[in-house]
Amino acid sequence: MKKVLLLLACTIACVYGENYCAMNSTAQTSCLISGSVCALCFEGGDLVWHLANWNFSWSVILIVFITVLQYGRPQFSWFVYGVKMLIMWLLWPIVLALTIFNAYSEYEVSRYVMFGFSVAGAIVTFILWIMYFVRSIQLYRRTKSWWSFNPETNAILCVSALGRSYVLPLEGVPTGVTLTLLSGNLYAEGFKIAGGMNIDNLPKYVMVALPSRTIVYTLVGKQLKASSATGWAYYVKSKAGDYSTDARTDTLSEHEKLLHMV
């Protein structure tokens, strides 16, 4: 195992040269993949100094990242979820700034190969960032929901009931949608989306909005107990098109609401 670590450290030092193998002596500053030279670089270079002095800090940072990634969901903690979203929103501009700075620094020292890679990385990052905004704006145009700008949101479930529109972000397009009514509380995908409802308030259809289209799910079956306002309703795909999930007025008929174009 030690030999593997030495070989890995030597490889890193060979790639980055003076950055990771700046020796205090007058010896060469680049590593060769040989036993003695590599060991000398690993034991005396800046890499070991960095790990020895910053290993605890990196451990704390990685623990925070693991916690945010694993428990950054609304059902666990809204605070951790907010931290996760903040990190995801900041990553694009930070990466873009780093690639631009690296391109400038590489150009200053005439390392044109690395300059080319840095420019390519900056271009790819910028394109991906623009694509995120385009898809988010398209989704917001259909749903009028700020969940559209959630980096994890690929689709949004829209349910109209009691004269209001309720939304729930989804990671993908479901085959069918089940709405569950428990003691007057309406649940979708395990999340409570509305309260104070009865069996007469369940909609005839629900919608799932994507950046490119809106999918309509029609009610095909339900089982309800009126006395306790408890039951379920199941919806399946019926059509897709350029529909808006936001009905402007309550005076529209069900058919008019469905055909209300964006």
UniProtKB/Swiss-Prot annotation:
One cellular component term from this protein's GO annotations in UniProt: membrane
Pfam families attached to this UniProt entry: CoV_M
Region (Interaction with N protein): 237-252
Subcellular location(s) per record: Virion membrane; Host Golgi apparatus membrane
The keyword Transferase appears for this protein: no
Keywords: Glycoprotein, Host Golgi apparatus, Host membrane, Membrane, Transmembrane, Transmembrane helix, Viral envelope protein, Viral matrix protein, Virion
Membrane topology: Multi-pass membrane protein
Subunit structure, as described in the record: Homomultimer. Interacts with envelope E protein in the budding compartment of the host cell, which is located between endoplasmic reticulum and the Golgi complex. Forms a complex with HE and S proteins. Interacts with nucleocapsid N protein. This interaction probably participates in RNA packaging into the virus.
Protein's UniProt name: Membrane protein
